[in-house]
Amino acid sequence: MKKVILILALTIFTNCFSQAIKVDTNSYSTTQLVNSVLINSPCVSATNVTTRTGSNFGSVNGIGFFQNTNPRFPMKSGVILSTGNVTNAVGPNATELNDGNASWPGDSSLESTLAQSGITMNSTNATVLEFDFTPISPTFSFEFLFASEEYGNFQCQFSDAFAFLLTNVNTGVTTNLAIVPNTTLPISVVTIRDYLYNSSCPSANAEYFGSYNGDSAAAGSATNFNGQTKLLNAFATLIPNTPYHIKLVIADRSDSGSDSAIFIASDTFNIGQDVLGQDLTVANNTAVCFGSSHTLTTNLSPTEYTFKWTKDGVIIPGATSENLTITKAGKYGV
């Protein structure tokens, strides 16, 4: 009996860590992928959502929704943009990803962005997701990771590329947010790598490398990519009530070999819709949009009680009534 229980426990443990992501290309429209999956906020939404991928050129589709239960992959769900067939991103890491044909073009804005960093690229098989939005707060951020077949084999000298191009429509100024933290380097297998998986070159920003999914780790990989970065954060400070455009683009370098992908986490795409307070949440449908107000009520009689309100432990001068109208996030008490 003890042996049977042990075998059962090992089976359950193995299955827990070998779950692959699920990719869905049919349940969401392009606009729904952005507004319902990435942003998911009643406060602000994206407009003019457009995509471009291989299926526009007689090749494979590189855009889809994914879900995950594998603890080795740090996202539960989100949107995937791939330089190959997005459905082939499903793990385990068992096959080489070389999808796409010669009719699927690259992206000139990605090439121009890399050129500004001294990187020459002849791109192909580009997948693009872009939209307009007008923020109501200065905060812009989202969580993502980069995965690629090039990790291990080609991480020393050859890399696909991607960019998150944020443009202030009024000024025309564009900033690439897909950079290695605390640097100006575009993220790729060359700029984030660990020499343990290819000793031909030293590590580069290895603290941001997440996992190598080859060799003994292949069978338990959530995706079919050789490696991936850690969960990273793209962020910027915006001017409220100013129109912006964001272009998310990824492409193969030179040919369709060794595909790569960007995974963007659900509900993390903050395009300036900050809510008021942690307990007033989008998830509970109680969110208060930035710039709006909310009234805290004690339901106590002012004839029987005196009131002193605090914000973050500090007494608020003049706040002595039974109710308090607030416009800023914080921890309030009475």
Name every feature range the model reports, one short phrase each.
Residues 1-23:
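Bacterial Sec-dependent N-terminal signal peptides
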Residues 19-275:
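Aromatic (Trp/Tyr/Phe) and Gly/Pro-enriched flexible surface segments
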Residues 223-227, 313-320:
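Short beta-strand segments within Ig-like beta-sandwich modules, predominantly Fibronectin type-III
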Residues 272-285:
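Proline-enriched interdomain boundary motifs that mark the N-terminal boundary
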Residues 287-302:
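A short beta-strand segment in extracellular, disulfide-stabilized domains
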Residues 300-313:
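Solvent-exposed loop segments of extracellular immunoglobulin-like
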Residues 320-333:
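Solvent-exposed segments in extracellular or luminal domains encompassing
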